[in-house]
Design a protein with these regions (language model features):
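Hydrophobic/aromatic residues positioned on beta-strands within the core alpha/beta folds
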Residues: 95-97
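Non-catalytic signal-transmission and effector/linker regions of two-component phosphorelay proteins
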Residues: 1-20, 119-135
Length: 135
């Protein structure tokens, strides 16, 4: 498991980041949010569709997006495009999760991907690596 006390390289303080999780399966979404809150110093907000995600970014500026590919109303690629077209969010790293992912589309957009079922340690390592790069 990642070190719960991820420290800022400058002054040793803990850098708390915000993560927007977009997952329509409530069991998986709650699992991801709980894993983030229990195993990292970061905060996660769960929404269940693309429209809720677009509304959420009017109130928060996440440091990481975690998107399911198969969402109601729009797929994860369409949501990624809308989120990253928003001023100030163009360079926010993104993890796309699904049992079936369109690899070519992910590569064109430099989206990180994980297949379902998720391996928790792999998920937490990727979250830590992406957020650590933004410290």
């Amino acid at each position: 498991m990642p070190d719960k006390q991820a420290q800022s390289p400058v002054d040793g303080t803990i850098a708390v980041r915000s993560i927007l999780v977009v997952e329509d399966d409530s069991d998986i979404g709650l699992f991801l949010v709980q894993a983030i809150s229990q195993e990292t110093p970061h905060q996660a907000l769960l929404v269940t569709d693309g429209f809720q995600a677009l509304k959420a970014i009017t109130n928060i500026k996440p440091d990481l997006f975690i998107l399911d590919y198969w969402l109601p109303s729009m797929n994860g690629i369409d949501l990624y495009d809308k989120l990253h077209a928003t001023k100030g969010l163009e360079h926010i790293p993104t993890i796309m999760i699904s049992a079936q992912l369109p690899k070519r589309e992910l590569q064109k957009r430099a989206i990180h991907s994980l297949n379902k079922p998720l391996e928790l340690d792999e998920f937490l390592r990727l979250v830590g690596r992406l957020l650590g790069a933004r410290a």
